[in-house]
Curated annotation (Swiss-Prot):
The gene is rpoC1. The keyword Hydrolase does not apply. Binds 1 Mg(2+) ion per subunit. Binds 1 Zn(2+) ion per subunit. This is DNA-directed RNA polymerase subunit beta'. One of its GO terms (biological process) is DNA-templated transcription. Its cofactor is Mg(2+); Zn(2+). It comes from Porphyra purpurea (Red seaweed). GO terms for cellular component: chloroplast; DNA-directed RNA polymerase complex; mitochondrion. Belongs to the RNA polymerase beta' chain family. RpoC1 subfamily. Its main location: plastid.
Length: 629
């Protein structure tokens, strides 16, 4: 089997020269024949259902449809590897080469690339220092442009002329044979290509640099004209740095992507379904062949120009359907998908297939609230956990001697034996998992949690981490990922664990805050409720005694009681008692609004009582324990 593995350091995207495009598609067969150019618009033969030669699915250019079998069937099997059939000219090799072998279409007339003409910045217009509308007029055969000027005439270089203007000037200018050699006027992509070829990049860059050092002083902000010059300077410098020629923005050769990336498949009823790109390529080849034929029979100029314009529009549709002119539609008036549509957007090749790849050791399920969980925990369904941690479970089963090999371990897992769950519980201890909710708009969109096995099929999530994920429980789904290596697990535990991410990276404010029933519970514990009087005004020797009395239903949660408290009271009323009582042993009792202090004759505190409720004592105890922890 051929090894297609290649190592590379980086990927560079740049303009491709016509020679480079030919190089992509051209191949030399073992018999010395060079193939690669597509000349026919046919796809497959309706009788034999085999690809047509020199067509869009040609086996000679792209390789055989069946492994190790030529087009005519003379050579079959692996033993004929590398042989080129003398009857059909197909090389005997694997069919998977049709996934990467390209071809090309040699155009009878140059056409501009619609991305560089009608993009957000028209690079062709910027490079030529023309307006976008002016370039469009030239490309689509509405106006002529002077590609070479002469001192004897009033025509300037890159000046646009309407058709009737050029007709009236043509006879006058070309009367003299000498002037005929000096002035040139062009139309269409050929004229644009000539103008781009004639650009002296070094000279233009030097001129623009001089202008950049002397910006206009009349305005505080740079003018639009100055900004355009700076944009042009950046573009010219990029051309110089990359070694690209501006004329490469005009096609003379069109690349054709491999046939297995634009397949044609037979449906049940005998009909065929084909990729939209094949229709675009077919239109281009038909128009290109017609243009070549018209040129060869010396057809009138107006007919040739019309055909060139149609070829330009066909190539525009292939690159970006609907960017300019009428959108090409297929059956049911559905716009056909062009190369741009395949690449761009959420469903495009980059976001869907390259950035959005499915990964191993991951799962997805609906989230439900788990109020019983700790902040660093999440509830993971047992089925999902067993599937995600299967390699770890198998390893542990073999280590414990419950099975001898992987096959036996997998059978044991399939049978759902009870010992599996004990092993799974051991495996997930201290092994964090990553939870992610799309869209991941900031770094808190993916956090680590310690999994707890739960019944059912829903992931349980702590309610306090919902603001960070922007999650709610109305059907939201979350993805689970298992960090495999020890480094990944350590990183997840140290950096990504939910309790370590309580500040918002955007504002620096806490993003984990008590909410909903927690706030209600805190309010209820600390609220005043005069109607609850059971055990009110009783004295207790310690705060713990109050909690015990409440648990035994001796006092109500909101009843005001007096409890001994040896800590420091931070209050403005400490200096101003309501009443002072002096006892026979010169000891003093000071009465305040919410506490009582008894002092001896030397003003040393003997005992202190505070007026509070069992609810507030419970609330204070919880806060104190969490701060100490």
């Amino acid at each position: 089997m051929t090894n297609f593995e290649q190592y590379f350091d980086y990927v560079k995207i740049s303009l491709a020269s016509p020679e480079k495009i030919r190089q992509w598609g051209e191949r030399s067969l073992p018999n010395g024949q060079i193939v690669g150019e597509i000349t026919k618009p046919e796809t497959i033969n309706y009788r034999t259902l085999k690809p047509e030669m020199d067509g869009l699915f040609c086996e000679k250019i792209f390789g055989p449809v069946k492994d190790w079998e030529c087009h005519c069937g003379k050579y079959k099997r692996f033993r004929y590897k590398g042989i080129v059939c003398e009857r059909c000219g197909v090389e005997v090799t694997e069919s998977r080469v049709r996934r990467h072998r390209m071809a090309y279409i040699e155009l009878a007339s140059p056409v501009t690339h619609v991305w560089y003409l009608k993009g957000s910045t028209s690079y062709i217009a910027l490079a030529l220092d023309l307006k976008v509308k002016e370039v469009e007029k030239i490309v689509y055969f509405h106006s002529y442009v002077v590609t070479q000027s002469s001192e004897e005439t009033n025509l300037k270089y890159k000046q646009l002329l309407e058709g009737y203007e050029w007709k009236s000037l043509e006879e006058e200018i070309y009367q003299n044979q000498d002037e005929n050699n000096q002035i040139e006027v062009g139309i269409g992509a050929e004229a644009i290509q000539k103008l781009l070829k004639d650009l002296d990049l070094e000279y233009i860059a030097e001129t623009l640099r001089l202008e950049a050092t002397n910006p206009p002083k009349s305005f505080k902000t740079p003018s639009l004209k100055f900004n355009k010059k700076m944009k042009r300077l950046r573009l010219i410098e990029n051309f110089i740095a990359t070694g690209a020629d501006p004329s490469w923005m005009v096609f003379t050769v069109i690349p054709v992507i491999p046939p297995d990336l634009r397949p044609m498949v037979q449906l049940d009823g005998g009909r065929f379904a084909t990729a939209d790109l094949n229709e675009f390529y077919r239109r281009i080849i038909n128009r290109n062949n017609r243009l070549s034929r018209l040129k060869s029979i010396l057809a009138p100029e107006i007919i040739i120009r019309n055909e060139k314009r149609m070829l330009q529009e066909a190539v525009d549709s292939l690159m970006d359907n609907g960017r300019r002119g009428r959108t090409v539609v297929g059956a049911n008036n559905r716009p056909l998908k062009s190369l741009s549509d395949i690449i761009e957007g959420k469903q495009g090749r980059f976001r869907q297939n390259l950035l959005g790849k499915r990964v191993d050791y991951s799962g997805r399920s609906v989230i439900v609230v788990g109020p019983h969980l700790k902040l660093h925990q999440c509830g993971l369904p047992r089925e999902m956990a067993l599937e995600l941690f299967q390699p770890f479970v198998i390893h542990r089963l073999i280590l414990q001697g419950l099975v001898n090999n992987i096959k036996a371990a997998k059978k044991m897992i399939q049978k759902n034996e009870s010992s599996i769950w004990n092993v799974l519980n051991e495996v997930i201890q201290g092994h964090p998992v990553l939870l992610n909710r799309a869209p991941t708009l900031h770094r808190l969109g993916i956090q680590a949690f310690e999994p707890i096995l739960v019944e059912g099929r829903a992931i349980k999530l702590h309610p306090l981490v919902c603001p960070a994920f922007n999650a709610d429980f109305d059907g939201d789904q979350m993805a689970v990922h298992v960090p495999l290596s020890l480094e990944a697990q350590a990183e997840a535990r140290l950096l990504m664990l939910a309790p370590h991410n309580f500040l918002s990276p955007a504002t620096g404010q806490p993003i984990i805050m008590p909410s909903q029933d927690m706030v209600l519970g805190c309010y209820y514990l600390t609220a005043n409720n005069p109607s609850q009087q059971r055990g009110a005004s009783q004295y207790f020797a310690s705060l713990e005694d109050v909690v015990i009395a409440y648990e035994k239903k001796k006092v109500d949660l909101h009843a005001y009681i007096w409890a001994r408290f040896d800590g420091v009271i931070d209050s403005d009323q400490v200096k101003f008692p309501i009443k002072i009582e002096t006892h026979h042993d010169n000891s003093v009792t000071k009465f305040f609004d919410n506490h009582i202090i008894k002092e001896d004759a030397e003003h040393q505190r003997i005992v202190q009582y505070i007026r509070t409720t069992p609810g507030r004592i419970i609330f204070n105890k919880i806060i104190q324990e969490s701060l100490v922890a």
